[in-house]
Amino acid sequence: MDTLFMTTVTATPAIKEDRILILDFGSQYSQLIARRVRDSGVFCEMFPYDIDTQRITDFGAKGIILSGGPESVHAENSPRINDAVFELGVPVLGICYGMQAMAERFGGKVHASDIHEFGAATINIDGKSTLTNGIEDAAAKLNVWMSHGDKVVDAPQGFDIVASTPSCPIAIMADDSRHYYGLQFHPEVTHTAQGQALLGRFVHEICDCAGSWTPDNIIDMRIEQLKKQIGDKQVLLGLSGGVDSSVVAALLHKAIGDQLTCVFVDTGLLRLHEGDQVMQIFAENMGVKVIRVDAEELFLTALAGESDPEAKRKIIGKTFIDVFANSAREISEQSDGKVIEFLAQGTIYPDVIESAKSHQGKAHVIKSHHNVGGLPDDLAFELVEPLRDLFKDEVRKLGITLGLPAKMINRHPFPGPGLGVRILGEVTKEFADILRSADAIFMEELEKSGWYEKTAQAFAVFQPIKSVGVVGDGRRYAWVIALRAVETVDFMTARFAHLPYDLIETVSNRIMNEIAEVSRVTYDVSSKPPATIEWE
């Protein structure tokens, strides 16, 4: 089997009967459209705009959304909408480029704009439409997020102009009779205040979709799928103690009971005291078998001398598989020869997207994830990945519904490769110990100040550069630590957390005073995009 590409999830009819097809024209916000549709309780999937006609027809969508994109409809070989989209007789919503492509398809005029609109804007509601009636921030106005160079200047026949801005004559167009709609702005981003309301109106009232994509229904669907996939076979789960693998453990335990064995691998790349904490949490809250494996020496030896981030991820992925294979053999020997055939992982949708191994297959490789692009081709197990098409906040909701403790569910994410991708360059035990101590100080101060709950993810990064410092009357030439904290809902986009200066100062002073090997602390003010959340 191909372990690197996502297969379409087959859901039970009750939860998947009403669904939306999203055709991706390359927008950086495309994944957010899927998030917002699912927030409305409606199942959706996203495919590249040029999938073949049969797949569009067979999908059975009750509505189609055309995403934005970086192209111009005037450019040679620019993306075009498949005619099948408009032959199905279902509602269609075009966003940004999707609106422009739809306008051109039906005979409207699209021009390059003299004034490009990027950022916040206020549009005037000039007309009426099923999509917009009763949805506004103030009297006949909407606060939205624009990101376009071209604009529709002449609406196609049958379309009414619903909204405009001083520089964009058609910000919303609508053909209520055929249920075709175009938005020049991005309803999927949080900066568009009524964006969720607009998308909810489209999927529920215009497409007539029920809100059946709920945590309870997702859990029922997944349990049914897991039972069907696994049968009476044995499953090994690589447990990290993070949200994703914990939810997978709960789902599998509910589906197959004692056919599941969890292996917690202490790689030497964990946070301070994390191994003991994970074992304690699972002993107190989960009735699953957990085996702890001390593999610090194995991982550090495998990583010795390697500084390339992609290579480190792949080494860590391969070493994990070696440890799991070893554990599987030992478990088999201790359980009357029962062979473990399945390996379960906490892979989630952003992992797949950033590894460019999703069903689209068109994204640039940003970074491999050890449980996606970092797995060996000759993997001896069949993969079980029940969260592979879910976003992080959906996973958290599943965890809460499954009854996992809030402390476990609300933990900040920790990457599978652990500190291996938070130590820039070569990984050594010395660097790992320094980073562990610095990270623990950062977490302690965040929790004391109440900022841990206000941030989605925070951590320290070891930088393999030295900086001159002064301690007393002496010179200190030591390492640099960077602090990173972000605010995000879905981890597809994020902004750096605006921590109070006095908090940053406290953390910085403690790290430099308590860790002799550190002489300087910096704070990362990069947002995603263009940066990723993790440094490597």
Swiss-Prot record:
Catalysed reactions, as listed in the record: XMP + L-glutamine + ATP + H2O = GMP + L-glutamate + AMP + diphosphate + 2 H(+)
Annotated metabolic or biological route of this protein: Purine metabolism; GMP biosynthesis; GMP from XMP (L-Gln route): step 1/1
PROSITE patterns the UniProt entry points to: GATASE_TYPE_1, GMPS_ATP_PPASE
SUPFAM superfamilies the record matches: Adenine nucleotide alpha hydrolases-like, Class I glutamine amidotransferase-like, GMP synthetase C-terminal dimerisation domain
Active site as annotated: C96, H186, E188
Residue positions binding ATP: S240, G241, G242, V243, D244, S245, S246
InterPro entries, sorted: Class_I_gatase-like, GATASE, GMP_synth_C, GMP_synth_GATase, GMP_synthase, GMPS_ATP_PPase_dom, NAD/GMP_synthase, Rossmann-like_a/b/a_fold
Keywords associated with the record: ATP-binding, Glutamine amidotransferase, GMP biosynthesis, Ligase, Nucleotide-binding, Purine biosynthesis
Domain Glutamine amidotransferase type-1: 19-212
One Pfam assignment: NAD_synthase
E.C. code: 6.3.5.2
An annotated Gene Ontology molecular function: GMP synthase activity
Broad EC category: ligase
Domain GMPS ATP-PPase: 213-411
GO cellular component: cytosol
Function: Catalyzes the synthesis of GMP from XMP.
HAMAP family: GMP_synthase
Subunit structure: Homodimer.
Alphabetized PANTHER family for the sequence: GMP SYNTHASE [GLUTAMINE-HYDROLYZING] (PTHR11922:SF2), GMP SYNTHASE-RELATED (PTHR11922)
Name this protein carries in UniProt: GMP synthase [glutamine-hydrolyzing]
Species of the source: Psychrobacter arcticus (strain DSM 17307 / VKM B-2377 / 273-4)
Gene name of the encoded protein: guaA
